[in-house]
Amino acid sequence: MATIEVKDREGAAKGSVELPDEIFAQKVNIPLIHQVVVAQQAAGRQGTHSTKTRGEVRGGGKKPYRQKGTGRARQGSVRAPQFTGGGTVHGPKPRDYAQRTPKKMKAAALRGALSNRAQHGRIHVVSEFVPEDVTTKRTQTALKTLRKITDSDKVLVVLSREDQHNRLALRNLPEVHILDANQVNTYDVLYADDIVFTEAGYQEFLAHAKGSKIAASQEDDQ
């Protein structure tokens, strides 16, 4: 079982935590991860797009000219698809893009994504970003702490659900995406260059992982 250092606000080691093998040392299944990420992105689509067919466009009930004798092609409505202002043929209609993904697949994909980040040294744990007694320039203080940990432009910060102090300090930083410990997902882990847990957030994540069977045994996946 691997361990990583817990850094303080100055970037110095103040302890260590273990990275459980059942979460951070698993096989990276790229096709599975791709399937889960695509499903997650699809679920975020609104699917409210809509176009009108010739039967739904207002007007066009009158035949524009007689059937025969004009030398022109016969037409029955000015709302036919070939006319400007006419209906759309096979256009998009409202639909649900959500794909059903089994929980075990989501869990295995997340384990693979976290394992990849751990193998490349992109998992970090910090005691805190801002002390509780700091009430001014919190964002500046939090950014200074973050830069002692990583220089990445895309950072996923995982906080304890109750940690409002650090959340308020970090939320306006454009390079930071904040998640609660129970919201960690495959897409956000892969999108970020580095993942930084607070110490409390890391312990909460491990508890949630075991409770939701993210740390399921290998036998369950086979």
UniProtKB/Swiss-Prot annotation:
<dbReference type="InterPro" id="IPR023574">
    <property type="entry name" value="Ribosomal_uL4_dom_sf"/>
</dbReference>
<protein>
    <recommendedName>
        <fullName>Large ribosomal subunit protein uL4</fullName>
    </recommendedName>
</protein>
<keyword id="KW-0687">Ribonucleoprotein</keyword>
<keyword id="KW-0699">rRNA-binding</keyword>
<feature type="region of interest" description="Disordered">
    <location>
        <begin position="42"/>
        <end position="100"/>
    </location>
</feature>
<dbReference type="GO" id="GO:0006412">
    <property type="term" value="P:translation"/>
</dbReference>
<dbReference type="GO" id="GO:0005840">
    <property type="term" value="C:ribosome"/>
</dbReference>
<dbReference type="InterPro" id="IPR002136">
    <property type="entry name" value="Ribosomal_uL4"/>
</dbReference>
<dbReference type="GO" id="GO:0003735">
    <property type="term" value="F:structural constituent of ribosome"/>
</dbReference>
<comment type="function">
    <text>One of the primary rRNA binding proteins, this protein initially binds near the 5'-end of the 23S rRNA. It is important during the early stages of 50S assembly. It makes multiple contacts with different domains of the 23S rRNA in the assembled 50S subunit and ribosome.</text>
</comment>
<comment type="function">
    <text>Forms part of the polypeptide exit tunnel.</text>
</comment>
<comment type="similarity">
    <text>Belongs to the universal ribosomal protein uL4 family.</text>
</comment>
<keyword id="KW-0689">Ribosomal protein</keyword>
<dbReference type="GO" id="GO:0019843">
    <property type="term" value="F:rRNA binding"/>
</dbReference>
<dbReference type="InterPro" id="IPR013005">
    <property type="entry name" value="Ribosomal_uL4-like"/>
</dbReference>
<keyword id="KW-0694">RNA-binding</keyword>
<feature type="compositionally biased region" description="Basic residues">
    <location>
        <begin position="60"/>
        <end position="71"/>
    </location>
</feature>
<comment type="subunit">
    <text>Part of the 50S ribosomal subunit.</text>
</comment>
<dbReference type="GO" id="GO:1990904">
    <property type="term" value="C:ribonucleoprotein complex"/>
</dbReference>
<dbReference type="Pfam" id="PF00573">
    <property type="entry name" value="Ribosomal_L4"/>
</dbReference>
